[in-house]
Amino acid sequence: MPRILIADDEDSMRMLVARAIAMDGHDTMTAADGAEALDLLTREQGRFDLLLTDIQMPVMDGIALALAAARDFPDLKILLMTGYADQRERASGLNAIVHDVVTKPFTVADIRTAVADALAARKG
């Protein structure tokens, strides 16, 4: 069963995404910001199959989190989420470490498909 770490500062979004991907049998952990997510990644020694993170968050944003996660855990697959076009553009320079950017709002089916695609893809 794939382990997925979800980072989003919006409680409702974290819960929605966690429930949606749990429907496919994935084991999820959640974090309210990038710093908390990085702490979980470190504590769990990177033992996640996917990091699914919002870009715009307090304390540490999703791009800083993605860069730190890719540096410390190069085999970790990363999927970003954003509701802002300018944030999506910021993420475009991260193609080497990020599988995709999912645009909010999305449906349950959209996020389940994006997660399945990311998990099925080869890293690098």
Which residues are covered by each model-predicted region?
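Receiver (REC) domain active-site loop signature in two-component systems and cognate sites
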Residues: 57
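Charged docking surfaces used in two-component/phosphorelay signaling
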Residues: 15-23
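C-terminal output helix
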Residues: 106-119, 123
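Acidic catalytic/metal-coordinating carboxylates
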Residues: 33-36, 61-65
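Active-site T/S-Asp motif of two-component receiver
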Residues: 53-54
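Acidic, metal-coordinating helix/loop segments flanking the phosphotransfer/catalytic sites
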Residues: 30-50, 89
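As written
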Residues: 62, 93-102
